[in-house]
Amino acid sequence: MAQQRRGGRRRRKVDYIAANHIDYVDYKDVDLLKRFISERGKILPRRVTGTSAKNQRKVANAIKRARIMGLLPFVAED
């Protein structure tokens, strides 16, 4: 049996940081950083969030700083 391909055209993900003209990703802005964290507390990859490589590095560093400062958890509670 031949397998059929499914799906159509995928919508391109938009870089949230670039779209909203955010110049500096602040580690104290927890609401912004929570957009880039999974329910388990892990940093979401670029292919999921759609951020550019440059902005992904900014987000990752800000999340790591916020974790060390105690603003974000390292792992989510069940």
Swiss-Prot record:
Alphabetized UniProt keyword annotations: Ribonucleoprotein, Ribosomal protein, RNA-binding, rRNA-binding
Domain of life the protein comes from: Bacteria
GO molecular function, one term: structural constituent of ribosome
GO BP: translation
Entry GO CC: cytosolic small ribosomal subunit
Matches recorded under Pfam families: Ribosomal_S18
Assembly mode: Part of the 30S ribosomal subunit. Forms a tight heterodimer with protein bS6.
Function in brief: Binds as a heterodimer with protein bS6 to the central domain of the 16S rRNA, where it helps stabilize the platform of the 30S subunit.
Family: Belongs to the bacterial ribosomal protein bS18 family.
Protein name: Small ribosomal subunit protein bS18
Organism field: Lactobacillus acidophilus (strain ATCC 700396 / NCK56 / N2 / NCFM)
